[in-house]
C-alpha cells in the first residue's frame, strides 16, 4: 500500500502560527490529519527555551558546560541544584506551553472556520517528555529527582492546555528524542536498557485523556540539523513502539519513525515485521528528504516497497501508512520550507496511482 497521509512532527521555520497553517493547508491539500502550529517563537529550537528558563532560576546554579559529541554545536550549560534546595521543592516557572497552544488554537479555529483548514483536522500540540529538558542539562546526581519534579510541572502545564481546549479538536504528540540518545549512548550518555525508559513513556501516554489522540515521534535528534547518530535499522524504534504499546493503559494513536533519506536497504526496514502495534495505530515514516536534490532517483519507491513488505509480516498485517520528515522543519532554511511542503504532496500524488 502506498502512503496515504501526512504527519508533521512539530517545528516549521516560518514567521508564525498563521503562516505555518496557511502554507501547510495550501501546499498539502489532502492527507493531513493534525495541524501543527510550527512551534514558532521561543519554542523554535525545541527545549532550548526551557533550558534558558532553568538557567535563570535561583534554585539552580552553574556547574560548567557539557559537550554534545557528534553534533556541530557549542558546549551547553550544565546546571545543578543550588545548595540547600531539594528537587521536590524546586519552584518551576510557567513553562510556556499551555499559553502558546491556547493562543495558537485561536488561529487554528479561525482558519478552520473560514475553510482554510479542512474540517476534521485536529490541532496538534507537541510536548517534550519530562526527561528531555532535564537529562544532560543537570549533573547526573540531580537528574532523577529533577525529572520527577519537572514531570509534575510539565503535566500540570499540559492539563491546563487540555482544560482550555475542546478535546474533540485537539491531539498531543510526545517528542521522544533524548530517550533514544540514552538508549544508543549518544550525546555522551552511558547506554541504558529499554526497561529504564519504557515506564516514563507510558506515563506520558497515559497522561492524555482517552478522548484525545496521542502520538509519539521516535526521533534521533536534530541539534545542528543532524542526528546524534544514524540509526542502523528500525529495530530500536520498533522495540520502543512495542514496549510503550504494551505498557500504556490507553492506545497510542500514532508513531512517527526516523528513516535517513539515503537509507534504502531492505535490512533497515526488516524489523517492521516484529511491530506489535494494533491495526488502528497510525504509522508515519520519514520518506520526505530534507535534501531532495541529493537523493538518488527511485529511493522513495524502494523505501515504500520495503515498508509494505515488512508491515505485511507484522502482527496487524498490511495497512495504510503515511509520510513525514525525519524530525521537524525548524532547522530547515525558511526558503526551503515551501519546497518540502510541496514534496509531501508530490510523494502522495506520485504513489497514488499504485493504490
Task: Report each predicted region and the residues it spans.
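Active-site beta-loop-alpha junctions enriched in small/polar residues
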Residues: 11, 128-132, 175-179, 219-223, ...
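Structural preference for beta-strand elements that scaffold enzyme active sites
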Residues: 2-9, 31-35, 120-126, 169-173, ...
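Acidic (Asp/Glu)-rich catalytic clusters
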Residues: 25-26, 108-122, 162-169, 199-211, ...
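Active-site-proximal, glycine-rich beta->alpha crossover segments in alpha/beta enzymes
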Residues: 72-166, 171-196
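A contiguous, surface-oriented mixed alpha/beta subdomain in the mid-to-C-terminal portion of proteins
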Residues: 200-284
Amino acid at each position: 500500500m502506498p502512503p496515504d497521509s501526512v504527519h508533521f512532527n512539530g517545528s516549521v521555520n516560518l514567521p508564525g502560527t498563521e503562516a505555518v497553517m496557511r502554507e501547510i493547508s495550501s501546499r498539502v491539500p489532502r492527507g493531513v490529519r493534525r495541524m501543527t502550529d510550527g512551534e514558532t517563537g521561543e519554542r523554535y529550537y525545541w527545549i532550548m527555551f526551557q533550558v534558558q528558563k532553568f538557567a535563570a532560576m535561583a534554585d539552580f546554579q552553574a556547574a560548567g558546560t557539557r559537550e554534545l559529541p557528534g553534533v556541530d554545536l557549542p558546549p551547553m550549560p550544565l546546571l545543578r541544584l543550588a545548595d540547600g534546595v531539594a528537587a521536590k521543592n524546586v519552584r518551576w516557572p510557567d513553562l510556556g506551553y499551555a499559553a502558546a497552544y491556547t493562543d495558537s488554537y485561536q488561529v487554528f479555529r479561525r482558519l478552520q472556520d473560514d475553510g482554510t483548514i479542512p474540517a476534521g483536522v485536529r490541532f496538534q500540540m507537541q510536548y517534550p517528555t519530562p526527561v528531555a529538558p532535564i537529562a544532560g542539562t543537570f549533573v547526573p546526581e540531580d537528574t532523577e529527582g529533577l525529572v520527577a519534579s519537572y514531570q509534575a510541572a510539565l503535566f500540570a502545564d499540559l492539563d491546563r492546555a487540555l482544560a482550555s481546549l475542546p478535546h474533540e479538536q485537539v491531539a498531543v504528540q510526545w517528542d521522544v528524542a533524548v530517550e533514544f540518545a540514552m538508549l544508543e549512548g549518544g550525546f555522551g550518555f552511558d547506554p541504558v536498557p529499554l526497561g529504564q525508559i519504557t515506564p516514563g513513556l507510558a506515563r506520558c501516554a497515559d497522561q492524555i485523556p482517552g478522548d484525545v489522540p496521542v502520538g509519539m515521534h521516535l526521533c534521533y535528534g536534530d541539534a545542528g540539523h543532524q542526528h546524534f547518530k544514524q540509526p542502523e535499522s528500525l529495530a530500536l524504534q520498533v522495540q520502543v513502539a512495542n514496549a510503550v504499546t504494551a505498557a500504556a493503559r490507553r492506545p497510542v494513536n500514532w508513531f512517527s519513525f526516523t528513516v535517513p533519506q539515503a537509507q534504502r536497504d531492505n535490512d533497515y526496514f526488516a524489523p517492521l515485521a516484529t511491530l506489535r502495534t494494533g491495526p488502528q495505530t497510525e504509522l508515519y515514516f520519514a520518506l520526505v528528504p530534507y535534501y531532495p536534490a541529493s537523493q538518488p532517483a527511485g529511493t522513495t519507491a524502494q523505501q515504500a516497497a520495503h515498508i509494505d513488505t515488512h508491515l505485511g509480516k507484522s502482527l496487524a498485517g498490511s495497512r495504510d501508512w503515511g509520510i513525514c520528515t525525519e524530525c521537524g522543519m525548524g532547522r530547515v532554511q525558511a526558503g526551503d520550507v515551501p519546497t518540502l511542503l510541496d514534496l509531501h504532496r508530490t510523494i502522495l500524488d506520485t504513489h497514488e496511482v499504485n493504490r
